[in-house]
Amino acid sequence: MNLASISQSYMSHNENERSIVPYIPPPYHPTAPALAVSASQMETMSLGILNQAMSSSAGASGALKDEKAAYGAVAEALRDPEPIRKIKRQVGIQTLKTLKVELSGMRRKKLILKIIMFICANVTMATSLVGGMSIVDEDIAKHLAFDGKGDWVSKTVHGLNLLCTTMLLAANKISEKVREEIARTKRDIAKRQSYVSAATMSWDGDSVTQLRDVKYGD
């Protein structure tokens, strides 16, 4: 082997070494494996929530009835597929705003009815007291008869008593209906609030999306 061949072999060996780029692996960061929740697991969770709702007390009060409604809404959110859940969530947020406005109006109506009932009750008691005293005391009866020329004062007192009593009964009946509407509206708010909250949660209970511009509760 001559000197030229040895020099050519050495140069080709150096070129091969320069052409090889050393591989540096990226840094390793350990992460937890992503666990997927199957439909059967979601159905199992839904049944567990329904069992919790049925195993609680009989719902004698409004708060317990609202709790049962909330459990049912969460179970419904777990049963629904993801696209339907998102649609119901968006619709539920808008409906919650409307229900809150309606609830405020019902509470104002209830307050007005309470004021009317208070006034009518006081007038009824006063006129009943005057009418009863006129029956017992003859002097009061004579004064009410306006010097014997007529009993228009007495008729006015009795008419006012009858009117206020009728208004009191009517206002009480309307107030009962308003209370039922308020209880039903609060239950609807609890159901939709629970569904929206469940729809914005991942399978492990961590919140994924924050709700904005929506306030719940009283």
UniProtKB/Swiss-Prot annotation:
Pfam families: Orbi_NS3. It comes from the Viruses. InterPro entries: Orbi_NS3. May play a role in the release of virions from infected cells. Belongs to the orbivirus NS3 family. This is Non-structural protein NS3. The lineage of its organism: Viruses, Riboviria, Orthornavirae, Duplornaviricota, Resentoviricetes. The gene is Segment-10.
